[in-house]
UniProtKB/Swiss-Prot annotation:
Topological category with respect to the lipid bilayer: Lipid-anchor; GPI-anchor
Compartment(s): Cell membrane
Family from the record: Belongs to the glypican family.
GO BP: cell migration; regulation of neurotransmitter receptor localization to postsynaptic specialization membrane; regulation of presynapse assembly; regulation of signal transduction; synaptic membrane adhesion; Wnt signaling pathway
Propeptide intervals in chain numbering: 530-556
Keywords in alphabetical order: Cell membrane, Deafness, Disease variant, Glycoprotein, GPI-anchor, Heparan sulfate, Intellectual disability, Lipoprotein, Membrane, Phosphoprotein, Proteoglycan, Secreted, Signal
Pfam families, sorted: Glypican
Name of the featured protein: Glypican-4
Glycosites: S494, S498, S500, N514
Source organism of this protein record: Homo sapiens
Coiled-coil region list: none
MF (Gene Ontology): coreceptor activity
Length: 556
């Protein structure tokens, strides 16, 4: 009996110790779950102090659990908020980049026009004095139309510039022939000879080509920046589906219900869930990358032959050169006009002398070359501005296909990619064995974590794809120097959230997008929950002791 009693006593003590340890660990783990639950602003009465039966759980694994039904429901809502927060940080950064660059470019362009107009006005006042003041509305109208084209569009630049030179010819023709009286009909006839006579030399043709190409490229580029920011803003409003929400809950908080509060989701597990929840956003990537490439093409034009700064900065000198050319060739031009339109009627003698005295044309029309050019617009140059935007555009490529990986790279969402064994796989603390699915809606049919209806693409995403496609076409036209018409992007891409998340909040200072796809490891079966629980340890020890006692009795 003594031999039998001692082992029995030792086994009994071991079982009791293991049971006490298991109870203590369970209590401790549930206490930590409760503390974290309350720290999120939830009612502590929802959280049990000790493990309870988990038959009430709908999404998280059942069995012994630290979560009540109320906790699971609130964790479900919290997981959606956590998802929105992390995705919005990624999206807001991109949105802020485009918004800030559009603002800089817009300010630069408008200030460039203001500087050019001021420079022309100052130069012409010094050069032509009263004659310019009498005709200044002609030049004001020119800049009004240029500004209107940039802000509103709906201006035919070629027709507008042709009209400017025709009106300038009428004014100049009167001045160089101030001894004659010209009716409106006669001046209209004079305008018809503008192309044939070329009274301003080759300046109108060259300037029209330069202005049209530069303005089209500049406005299209600015509109592209605005469209890009608008697309990001609309696409990035998160509205996860019910299936996505279930997967998010299981990934982020179901580990808490098992008491594993410090164990983060496996990286590939997170990747599958993000690719399922952001499936529609992945379909943007192809058209987005085409759009970025088209923007970069136009940027090259802005740095080269379509540089609007090099066109607008000397526009006063170019127009003045045209005026001087008209003055130098006024006799030949007048003779040809008189031949085509007929001889004009002379003014009375008194009015002739007074008109010549008032114009003082020959004495006042002298070229003027200001020593100081206009100050740099918006405190920068177009070259520096375009260089900066090009860098940001290159960094923005593959943004949508990289978004799931970048969300999982956030330490709040998943364990590191190298920590494959000590992570939460949706059932327990163990390696995640499923392969990572591809990006985009079509690849989600075999997603092991999120059930996605691949037959129903998001309507808002389709609208953004079309908006990008249209804008890309306009970029290519601008690259070739062709004028373009603009649609209202706010109407074309309107709609509520699509299921991808971004609300305008604080953004990181620089891009940090990872375009590398992380492939998971394939397997034929799911990973079961791992890590032996304290309760299981006590149970195994008890069984072992009972078997030992039975065998010892048989030996006796």
């Amino acid at each position: 009996m003594a031999r039998f009693g001692l082992p029995a006593l030792l086994c009994t003590l071991a079982v009791l110790s293991a049971a006490l340890l298991a109870a203590e660990l369970k209590s401790k783990s549930c206490s930590e779950v409760r503390r974290l639950y309350v720290s999120k602003g939830f009612n502590k009465n929802d959280a049990p102090l000790h493990e309870i039966n988990g038959d009430h759980l709908k999404i998280c694994p059942q069995g012994s659990t630290c979560c009540s039904q109320e906790m699971e429901e609130k964790y479900s809502l919290q997981s959606k908020d956590d998802f929105k927060s992390v995705v919005s940080e990624q999206c807001n950064h991109l949105q802020a980049v485009f918004a800030s660059r559009y603002k800089k470019f817009d300010e630069f362009f408008k200030e460039l026009l203001e500087n050019a107009e001021k420079s022309l006005n100052d130069m012409f006042v010094k050069t032509y004095g009263h004659l310019y003041m009498q005709n200044s509305e002609l030049f004001k109208d020119l800049f009004v139309e240029l500004k209107r084209y940039y802000v509103v569009g709906n201006v035919n630049l070629e027709e507008m510039l042709n009209d400017f030179w025709a009106r300038l010819l009428e004014r100049m023709f009167r001045l160089v022939n101030s001894q004659y009286h010209f009716t409106d009909e006669y001046l209209e006839c004079v305008s018809k000879y503008t192309e044939q006579l070329k009274p301003f030399g080759d300046v109108p043709r060259k300037l029209k080509l330069q202005v049209t190409r530069a303005f089209v490229a500049a406005r299209t580029f600015a509109q592209g920046l605005a469209v890009a920011g608008d697309v990001v803003s609309k696409v990035s409003v998160v509205n996860p589906t019910a299936q996505c929400t279930h997967a998010l809950l299981k990934m982020i908080y179901c580990s808490h219900c098992r008491g594993l509060v410090t164990v983060k989701p496996c990286y590939n597990y997170c990747s599958n869930i993000m690719r399922g929840c952001l499936a529609n956003q992945g379909d943007l990537d192809f058209e987005w990358n085409n759009f970025i490439d088209a923007m970069l093409m136009v940027a090259e034009r802005l740095e080269g032959p379509f540089n609007i700064e090099s066109v607008m900065d000397p526009i006063d000198v170019k127009i003045s050169d045209a005026i001087m050319n008209m003055q130098d060739n006024s006799v030949q031009v007048s003779q040809k006009v008189f031949q085509g339109c007929g001889p004009p009627k002379p003014l009375p003698a008194g009015r002739i002398s007074r008109s010549i005295s008032e114009s003082a044309f020959s004495a006042r029309f002298r070229p003027h070359h200001p020593e100081e050019r206009p100050t740099t617009a918006a405190g920068t140059s177009l070259d520096r501005l375009v260089t900066d935007v090009k860098e940001k555009l290159k960094q923005a490529k593959k943004f949508w296909s990289s978004l799931p990986s970048n969300v999982c790279n956030d330490e709040r969402m998943a364990a590191g990619n190298g920590n494959e064994d000590d992570c939460w796989n949706g059932k327990g603390k163990s390696r995640y064995l499923f392969a990572v699915t591809g990006n985009g809606l079509a690849n989600q049919g075999n997603n092991p974590e999120v059930q996605v209806d691949t037959s129903k693409p998001d309507i808002l995403i389709l609208r953004q794809i079309m908006a990008l496609r249209v804008m890309t076409s306009k970029m290519k036209n601008a690259y070739n120097g062709n004028d373009v018409d603009f649609f209202d992007i706010s109407d074309e891409s309107s709609g509520e959230g699509s299921g991808s998340g971004c609300e305008y909040q604080q953004c990181p200072s620089e891009f940090d997008y990872n375009a590398t796809d992380h492939a998971g490891k394939s397997a034929n079966e799911k990973a079961d929950s791992a890590g032996v629980r304290p309760g299981a340890q006590a149970y195994l020890l008890t069984v072992f002791c009972i078997l030992f006692l039975v065998m010892q009795r048989e030996w006796r």
